[in-house]
């Protein structure tokens, strides 16, 4: 319950002059040594009609003087109890502290309001269960460096504590305290600052880390070079250009940055450096981009830096494209509005040589490659499996398949490749009924292309058809063989002609 006097004091906003000094004193509105007190709104008081202070500041002063009546008045005017405790600590008025501290309950709530390190420590001591570690941690939170400086020697003997405080200061981005700890205490893991700087993306903290590192080691130190390299890799991986530039001030290789930037498609970093590096490096980066399956924009940036001049390293590029099964760069070179670079066939040849059937089919669909081209390449490279699978997929009808394969033989120069396709044709006919015309045409085809063994086999198969027509075919084949000097074909044709003559009734 408020007394009548308290109610008057709490709600009195009128000028005090008409009341007279005696009434002001009786109302408890007179502050000894300062003058009359008048409430000014919710946050300020006027002292002796001239001096305006915040209620909290006035409360702190009154408590430091031990003036319990004025403290009570200012609390009545919504003054914060925490400032009363601070003032009481300044004047060492423990009776006031005892009276009001229980209403707050936790000294840690007061600490952020204190500027004086001595009062700060005194306030912390109000909680008798707190340790020095608690004091140091709050000192870091509240930027109370003098507390740490006071106990610096004691801290140096506790490596675990120093490391804990150092990392805490880094997380709170308290640069002054970080600097003091780094230069004055034995921090066993200084590098923790960099991990925190990366997480917070705090370049100031990152730079401070290098300042502390260089206080311990030189830029020529092997460990320092290793640290720089790790930082460059991580910063470029995350696309942090400012961090990359900061690290490069102290050493490291731009190549390290570029390879990571390509791998993770950080074009901002690439664009910053790419036009200042030698062509050989750009070529390696393009190969790395293929391996990393980089984006279209990354490839365009790299290619534009060498003006799309691919000749010096086409072989290496094709090898990388086939090895990693990533064809985007082939497509980009083909899509150029001017001066298209067509590597489709060159890449296809490598694929046919080294890749599986599904991979080749995927490539054929992507670049609209006709099956004849693939089959010819497969024949030259002796890939029987591809000839069979691709021809079967392209032409389900066997006669249609034979027709296309025969056309390929006509247009091929590679002898072994032609033979392979012809054997494949014969293999198809083994499971297909051929009428006389089809069988005779195929026999003549083998004669024209000097496929002796296949010619013999087809001659045997043709004996089921009309022998007169067969003899005419063999004479035609003999004429072809003599014209081209196909000795074995001629001998075979001649042999079968004689045989037909022997078995035919006169």
Curated annotation (Swiss-Prot):
ANK repeats: 54-83, 253-283, 313-343
Regulation: induction: Expressed in the early phase of the viral replicative cycle.
Keyword Endoplasmic reticulum listed: no
Family to which the UniProt record says this protein belongs: Belongs to the asfivirus MGF 505 family.
Superkingdom per UniProt: Viruses
Gene3D superfamilies membership: Ankyrin repeat-containing domain (1.25.40.20)
Function: Plays a role in virus cell tropism, and may be required for efficient virus replication in macrophages.
Protein name, as recorded: Protein MGF 505-9R
Keywords: ANK repeat, Early protein, Repeat
Keyword 4Fe-4S: no
InterPro entries named in the record: Ankyrin_rpt-contain_sf (IPR036770), MGF_505 (IPR004858)
């Amino acid at each position: 319950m408020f007394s009548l006097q308290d109610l008057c004091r709490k709600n009195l906003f009128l000028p005090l002059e008409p009341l007279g000094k005696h009434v002001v004193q009786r109302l408890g509105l007179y502050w000894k040594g300062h003058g009359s007190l008048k409430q000014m709104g919710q946050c300020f008081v006027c002292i002796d009609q001239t001096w305006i202070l915040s209620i909290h500041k006035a409360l702190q002063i009154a408590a430091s003087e031990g003036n319990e009546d004025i403290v009570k008045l200012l609390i009545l005017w919504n003054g914060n109890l925490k400032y009363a405790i601070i003032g009481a600590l300044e004047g060492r008025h423990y009776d006031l502290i005892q009276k009001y501290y229980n209403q707050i309950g936790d000294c840690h709530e007061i600490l952020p309001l204190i500027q004086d390190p001595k009062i700060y420590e005194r306030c912390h001591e109000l909680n008798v269960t707190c340790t020095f570690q608690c004091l140091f941690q709050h000192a870091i939170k509240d930027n109370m460096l003098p507390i740490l400086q006071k106990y610096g020697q004691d801290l140096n003997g506790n490596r675990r504590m120093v490391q804990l405080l150092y990392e805490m200061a880094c997380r709170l981005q308290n640069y002054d305290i970080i600097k003091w700890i780094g230069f004055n205490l034995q921090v066993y893991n200084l590098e923790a600052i960099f991990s925190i700087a990366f997480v917070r993306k705090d370049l100031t903290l990152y730079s401070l880390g290098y300042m502390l590192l260089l206080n311990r080691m030189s830029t020529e130190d092997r460990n320092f070079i290793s640290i720089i390299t790790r930082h460059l890799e991580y910063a470029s991986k995350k696309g942090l250009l400012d961090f990359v530039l900061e690290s490069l001030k102290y050493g490291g290789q731009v190549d390290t940055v570029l390879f990571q930037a390509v791998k993770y498609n950080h074009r901002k970093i690439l664009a910053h450096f790419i036009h200042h590096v030698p062509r050989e490096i750009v070529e390696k980066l393009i190969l790395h981009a293929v391996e990393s399956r980089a984006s279209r924009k990354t490839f365009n940036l790299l290619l534009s830096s060498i003006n799309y001049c691919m000749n010096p390293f086409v072989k290496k590029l094709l090898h990388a494209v086939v090895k990693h099964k990533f064809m985007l760069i082939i497509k980009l070179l083909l899509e150029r509005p001017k001066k298209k670079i067509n590597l489709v066939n060159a890449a296809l040849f490598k694929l046919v040589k080294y890749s599986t059937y599904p991979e080749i089919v995927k490539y054929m669909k992507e670049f609209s490659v006709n099956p004849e081209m693939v089959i010819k390449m497969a024949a030259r490279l002796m890939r029987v499996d591809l000839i069979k699978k691709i021809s079967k997929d392209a032409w389900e009808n066997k006669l249609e398949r034979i027709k296309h394969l025969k056309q390929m033989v006509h247009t091929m120069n590679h002898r072994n490749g032609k033979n392979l396709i012809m054997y494949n044709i014969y293999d198809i006919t083994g499971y297909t009924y051929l009428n006389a015309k089809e069988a005779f045409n195929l026999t003549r085809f083998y004669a024209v292309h000097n496929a002796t063994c296949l010619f013999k086999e087809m001659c045997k198969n043709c004996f089921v058809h009309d022998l007169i027509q067969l003899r005419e075919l063999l004479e035609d084949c003999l004429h072809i063989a003599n014209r081209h000097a196909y000795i074995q074909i001629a001998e075979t044709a001649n042999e079968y002609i004689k045989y037909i003559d022997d078995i035919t009734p006169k």
